[in-house]
Structures are given as structure tokens and as C-alpha cells.
């Protein structure tokens, strides 16, 4: 990243596991922090520990939510709204951009496509009125080697999101083409300027480098004794809230298959017992 390409005053937006990085590449002060729905409960717990440890400062936390999800996800979001009212719901920002929101709804419904977290931040920034967006870290999964600026294969995050055990944890619902189209849409319909501030990034193949050349001397501070993995709350906390009552291992396909096989004899026994009772009647 070339810091001279940044303006003198700017707001920082970060998302997901950014706190894994071993340096404060963009400083400790963050304007908006974005977390995905699937691990928001754990991310919120983790981030509050980061604040407690003076690892970061922030203004707002935003849930990267969509209104066109299934009923189970919508119920989860509604539940979170009551449990964690201090978190802003991202889809409230999306609704301010009616044309873009319709674009998202259509492609999720009919083509099973969704923007990535980095692009989601750009959408929220546009809805907030920002006109100049300076981007780094959005590489459309084109980077060779580790696609992250940090080691992402950590024990707890893999427990919660098994796909992180892979070198590149790309979901089929995401694609470079769809992300690019979303960014172009923001440019065309809302007049935002999108600049790249990492000259070696694949992003520069599609958007120009920032025209700025500020004499900024910024040396990222190296972290010491910092949080390097997502934190999982005590089991007692999960028991307090019904929606998360089962540990996430129950959501693992292999575990559920083995569990169902182990339960099969007992289920057959119950079914035969019920059949005998019906025959007696």
C-alpha cells in the first residue's frame, strides 16, 4: 500500500478478521467495523475484548446484512437486533440506494450472487454520502499465495467457519465479475470515484491509482501480545440465548451425518413401538 496516495484526512472502514494482522497497517482508529451475520455473535464478543485491551478504537459496528435472506437468517437478524441493539444493520444503508438494492435483490434471488465484504463497505460508504473511495485489500481472489494480509488459518475461526482450513476460502456465491459490476454500478448511478492505493494489486487493472501525492510518512506500528484469532464466548453465554443454543459443531455436515447414524437404532425402535400402539388401537 502506498500511503502517499491517501488524502490528508480520511475515515477508515475495516471488515471481518482484520485484527489478525501483525501491524496496524491502517492505524488503530476505525470509523466503521463490518462483520458478517454467520459469526456476528463471536465477532462482537471478540471486538469488545479488543477494545478492552486497547488494541483498537471504533465509532460504529455494522452487521453486513441483507433483507433477501431466508427466513432463518432474517429471524436471526431480528434476534440480534434485540440482543445487540448497539450494532447497526447494514441493510438499512442499502435501502437508501434503491436502484442498487434492487440490483442486489435480483442477482441474489435469480443468480445466487452476492457482493463480498469489501464491496459491501463501499456500498455503505456511498449511502453515507462519501464520494471518493480509496481501496486496498479488494483483490477479487486474484492474489497468488495467501489472499489475506495475515495468516488466516486459526483454530477458532476454522471451528466456526470450516472453509477457512483451505488456502483460499472463496464461496461460490462470490465472483470477481459480480463485485466489479457492483462497483461500476456505484460509479455510474451515484457518481462515486473509486481509486486504488495499492499499485501491485489486481484492483489497479480495473480502477485508477489515486491521483494524490501527499508527503505522508507512515510507518505501521508492529503489534505486540495481540489477539490473533476470533474468540469464542463461554458455553454458558450460548445457553442464555435460544437461537445459539447448539454449539456450531452441530452445523457441521459430517458431524450431523455421524450423529444421525448413531441415533438411527433408537429412532427405529421408537417408530416400531409407535406402530405397535397404532395396531393395538
Task: Go through the PLM ranges and name each one.
Residues 1-281:
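Metal-ion/cofactor- or nucleotide/acyl-coenzyme-handling active-site neighborhoods
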